[in-house]
Amino acid sequence: PVSDKGKKPVPAGDFKAVDSARCTPVDMQKVFNANVTDIFRNEYLSPRSPYTTLQLPKQGIGEWCHPLKTADIDDSGLRATVRKGLLETKLGIPFRTPAEGHNIAFTSLWDNYPDSLQIPLQGKASRAYLLMAGSTNHMQCHIDNGVIRVYYEDGTCDTLSLVNPDNWPPIEQIFFEDGKSFNRHAPSLYRLRLKTGELSN
């Protein structure tokens, strides 16, 4: 992350130092607006050009030569792992998420969802951990796919840009990294496998 207080890197921290007992999971139920499995089941119809284009297919995945491509997102393993509304991870970081019902707050430049969301926070913390999922594609590589901003009482804020492939991967696949033709030049990303509930990097 980059801080607006001088554009200095904000340290991500060492997961070994996480004290689960001091973690406070944030209840986001009021802003959840979909099931994560809906991501490629929707039809993203607007805004679109009225003219012939090579635009993204209406299901939100694929390209002009693969217009029917899709991916079945199965979050059964994630939901089965939830106990009393909490997902306990091997990193020691608990996340509040439901076993049933809406479990994601989607934002989008498509009209299906709002283009931004606000989540009220209070108290003090040394860092914040976010469990995120979303889509990206080849043409969105090396540009901001989204932005997270945390605002403080003193009027300042910290900003984290979500950039493919640095810290924003596609939900349906893992990056192939050989250190040669494809080298992210970034630490391995932790991935939560929705179908099994397993966390790995």
Regions from the language model: what does each represent?
Residues 2-201:
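N-terminal/edge-of-domain interface segments
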